[in-house]
Amino acid sequence: GKFREPVIRITNWARAFGATSQSGKYVFVSTASNIDLSQAPLTSPSVFNFWRPGYTPPNSTQLGQHNLVAPEFQIIDEVTAPAYVNLIQETVQNGIGWAAEGFTGHDVRAAYSAEIAIADNASALVDRLNRLLFYGQMSTTLRDRIIAGVNAVPIPAVTGSNQAAIDSAKLTRARTAIFFAMISPEYLVQR
C-alpha cells in the first residue's frame, strides 16, 4: 500500500465531513512542524516532493528484499506518529486552523450532521465512514473494533428533558468513530 501523506489526510477529513471556515478565510496555521503534520502545502524542499526518492524505511525487510522504495515513509518517526494522533483528535473534536479575527476557536470545522443523525446505530455510522474514508475497503476486524468503541459511548434514554445530553452523546459517538478510523493503520496506508 501507499502511505497517505499528512496533508491528504486532513484534506480527506475536510471533504468527507464538509468542513467549512467560520470566517470564510480558511485561516490555517502552518502544518510543517513535526508536532503537526511535518508537511505544509506548497513548501516541498525539492522537485521530488518532501522526501528523498530512493528512501527505504529502516528495518523494512519486505521492501529491502524486493529492492523497493517508499519515500513517503520518511516522514514517520517517534515524534510524528503520536503528533498526528494528537492533531487528528484536536481536528475531529474542535477543528483546525487559527481563530480568525472576530471569531473564537479553530477556523475550519466540521458539523458532522450526517454522522450525528445515524450515531445511534454504530454499524450504520461505521459503514458510512467505510464509504467516505476507506472507499469500501475497511476490514471486518477494524469495523468491529470501531463499532465496539462507538457502543462504549452510551446514549441516554429519552426523558423529555435530556435532549442536550442525547445530542452530546451522539456527537461524541460520531467523533469517536471518525477519530478511531483516521488513526487506524488501514486508513493511513491506502491500498
Placement of each model-derived feature along the sequence:
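Flexible, low-complexity segments enriched for small/polar residues
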Residues: G1-R191
